[in-house]
Amino acid sequence: LFLKLMDEASEIQAHAGGTIMLPEHLLWKHFQGMGGQAILAYLKDVVWPEMGKKYGDIFGKEFLIESPEILADIVGQLSALNLTSADTDIKGDAFEYFLKNAYQGVSIKDLGEYFTPRNVVRTMVSMVDPKFGEKIYDPFCGTGGFLIESFRYLKLRTKTTDDTDRILRKETIYGSEITSNARIAKMNMILFGDGHANLYRHDSFAHPQTGKFDIIITNPPYSQKTRYGNLYPVPSTSGDAVAMIHCFDALNEGGRACILMKEDFLTEGGDVGAVREYMFKNAKNFSVVSLPRKMFEPYTPTKTSILYFEKKGGRNS
């Protein structure tokens, strides 16, 4: 899917007189007419290693498809399609289908963080209303849904020049993900126009980002534990508490956040309550949008809300 979309994007750029995204010998049309065994050998021995050099860890070290017949069938069916003209949701559906099948050994509850409903994603992006030149950060980016939508939101509202294109691609989108889905997030960003340069695979809790971003938009994991809470203004071992303080701390003064949270955050005591009190002292313009309980089923029955706020200048302990 990635190679087919890259090929279509390169063809569009070539017709527009631009530079194609891939060398000629890596384009889809170069191998689509080969037999199954020849396609398998070419992708494994030529395309995969070169794409690995170009895009780093987006491509795994091993080419995992072993059946020439299955590969030839995939190539044949994709060759008949024009994916670029399809609604972007169709591309997202394809990646979600892949993830759900690739993670058959993982409980459906554990997959919930990756499949935030798109209407929720779009609502949250419109709430923060990104502006050109702002830095947008998702510290728990999963497969990149919030970052993709933010990137698309800006692209539609920004006049394209070499400078604006460079800033959007390299100085706007930031994210991290602890699982191997960081690779999928990077791939997703490239397919939707780039912005993958500042996506990292690491534990966000271990990497505070104090005052660096204009916008935080995220769906953090729920009910986790962390040993990195002592790195933050309100120390805790509760992942729920540290996720919120990580997001708050990463905002610059005047920055705004939109976070999909467990509704319990509004009433819990203990460490979560301490973080909530700290945020109420140091932020303003709070808004809460309560979501239906079944919004995330079948992944999780957890009742959730969208929390919006803006960070004040200075800090009150």
Tell where the protein language model's regions lie, with residue ranges:
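Structured alpha-helical segments in the cores of large, soluble enzyme domains
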Residues: A243-L251
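Flexible, glycine-/basic-rich loop-and-beta segments that form/coincide
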Residues: E297-S317
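Non-catalytic, mostly N-terminal accessory regions of nucleic-acid modification and defense proteins
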Residues: L1-V128, F132, N198-S204, S290-K294, ...
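Conserved short secondary-structure elements within globular domains
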Residues: F280-R293
